[in-house]
């Protein structure tokens, strides 16, 4: 954050990148037995993001200076030698007043993370966070809570450790509201009573931008765990969508976009009306032109709004504008920022008339072959959105050519899968070309292919996926694990869809 302040890295809540995978009932702990290459790669991304999150939590707990001192002592003590994890915790123990070793043992040797519920009488209970309908083995953690709460008109702060299923903090019984995650550095989820949530939202400016985003992300997670309803999430979302900070508004837009799995033929018109009414004015205010004065948060907000509205607003004017931007980018790839250009290409190709798809495809591929910069190539080829059989097969065939590197081959297949609500065309092509595709992709991508390509929220798509992978999953090392993850994530999405579709429809109807 010192070298590149424009990236606003300090405002990013890194644990959000770990929470989703770490909530799965099939997740493995960071510290696990490794016997093969797939064991190394299994959960590799989670290990890094969870590890970073835990270290950030420790730094926040003991202070940056003490954290640096502990890390420097650790590096000096073990210079040119080998270490184990306990060596780092021991070094940090020596510069802090906390038993970090005990805390780390649970976080690294157990899968998952805790959910802390704070009752109005000051009773705190912890359980293992899990998604709706999932069955997991319950665990407990030693959890550092950095509390912020309002009592008798004063905002107070304190740090407490809870390591039991139930803990009572009498001081919280008198609180108007409680926020248990100061500066949003904790690796846990939390919930409070509805009355306290209302009071917190009424005093939301007592929190900084990280904390505001954490409230929203936390309630979206509670919805996915079936701990709260759609109305609670929308209450938080609507409050933060009015914030003055573009980073906070962007968080609200991002959470709203996560409800896209509930958008269907029956409610898409109501959803489009909501977007045009509440969010199109904001995009119009920002415009689709990037200026030198725009900071990173404004740029990201514009890109996210444009993507959401372009996908779901069904706005003819926005489509027309997107076609112009896409053609401008194809003529001169330096004339439009890649974030805007990619969305424009997606909207233009998605809304292309029957008979125009081939022309769009050929023009984009021609520009792709001429382009020299990798980011330009990616913007061009991975933004295409076609659903007709001929062009879908052209996109997939392109993945097998020398124009697409082995490392990027799977991403074209992923793009096609995400474009299609019905995966019939995808598996028709895969059945004919699986040998060539699997031979071209790196082994790591072969093992992860089910997870990335075939995870779905459709029972019909999952049935096709299971039929496709059944004869080959044991042939390729690690693929069976990828199938397990695909099945778990797909079934979870379908459970959420079943649980919340009616509530989401009711929310949309209330907005009409």
Region annotations inferred by a language model:
Residues 15-23, 44-50, 125, 134-138, ...:
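Long, ordered, helix-rich scaffold segments
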Residues 143-149:
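Short polybasic amphipathic segments
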Residues 162-164:
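Short proline/glycine- and polar residue-rich coil/turn motifs
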């Amino acid at each position: 954050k010192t070298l590149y302040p424009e990236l606003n890295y300090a405002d990013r809540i890194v644990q959000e990148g770990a929470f989703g995978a770490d909530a799965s009932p099939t997740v493995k702990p960071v510290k696990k037995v490794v016997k093969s290459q797939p064991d190394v790669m299994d959960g590799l991304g989670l290990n890094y993001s969870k590890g970073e999150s835990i270290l950030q939590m420790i730094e926040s707990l003991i202070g940056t200076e003490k954290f640096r001192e502990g890390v420097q002592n650790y590096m000096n003590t073990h210079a040119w030698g080998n270490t184990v994890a306990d060596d780092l915790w021991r070094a940090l123990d020596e510069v802090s007043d906390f038993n970090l070793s005990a805390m780390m043992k649970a976080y690294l040797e157990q899968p998952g993370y805790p959910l802390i519920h704070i009752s109005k009488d000051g009773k705190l209970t912890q359980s293992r966070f899990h998604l709706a309908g999932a069955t997991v083995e319950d665990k407990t953690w030693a959890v550092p809570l950095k509390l912020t709460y309002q009592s008798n008109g004063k905002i107070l702060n304190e740090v407490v450790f809870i390591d039991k299923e139930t803990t009572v903090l009498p001081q919280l019984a008198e609180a108007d509201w409680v926020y248990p995650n100061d500066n949003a550095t904790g690796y846990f989820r939390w919930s409070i009573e509805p009355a306290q949530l209302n009071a917190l939202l009424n005093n939301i400016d007592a929190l900084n931008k990280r904390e505001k985003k954490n409230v929203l992300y936390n309630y979206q997670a509670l919805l996915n765990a079936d701990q709260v309803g759609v109305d609670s999430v929308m209450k938080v979302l609507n409050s933060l969508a009015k914030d003055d900070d573009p980073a906070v508004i962007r968080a609200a837009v991002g959470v709203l976009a996560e409800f896209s799995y509930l958008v269907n033929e029956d409610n898409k018109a109501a959803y489009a009306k909501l977007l045009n009414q509440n969010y199109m004015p904001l995009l119009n205010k920002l415009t689709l032109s990037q200026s030198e004065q725009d900071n990173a948060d404004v740029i990201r907000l514009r890109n996210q709004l444009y993507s959401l509205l372009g996908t779901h607003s069904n706005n003819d004017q926005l489509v027309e504008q997107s076609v112009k931007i896409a053609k401008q980018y194809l003529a001169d790839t330096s004339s439009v920022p890649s974030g805007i250009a990619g969305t424009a290409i997606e909207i233009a190709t998605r809304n292309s008339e029957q008979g125009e798809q081939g022309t769009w495809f050929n023009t984009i591929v021609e520009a792709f072959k001429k382009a020299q910069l990798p980011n330009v190539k990616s913007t061009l080829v991975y933004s295409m959105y076609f659903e007709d059989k001929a062009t879908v097969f052209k996109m997939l065939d392109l993945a097998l050519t020398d124009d697409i590197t082995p490392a990027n081959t799977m991403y074209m297949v992923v793009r096609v899968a995400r474009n299609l609500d019905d995966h019939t065309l995808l598996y028709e092509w895969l059945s004919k070309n699986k040998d060539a595709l699997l031979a071209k992709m790196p082994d790591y991508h072969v093992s992860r292919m089910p997870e990335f390509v075939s995870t779905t929220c459709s029972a019909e798509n999952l049935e096709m996926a299971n039929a496709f992978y059944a004869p080959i999953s044991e042939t390729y090392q690690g693929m069976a694990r990828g199938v397990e993850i695909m099945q778990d994530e797909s079934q979870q999405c379908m459970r959420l869809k079943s649980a919340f579709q009616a509530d989401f429809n009711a929310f949309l109807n209330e907005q009409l």
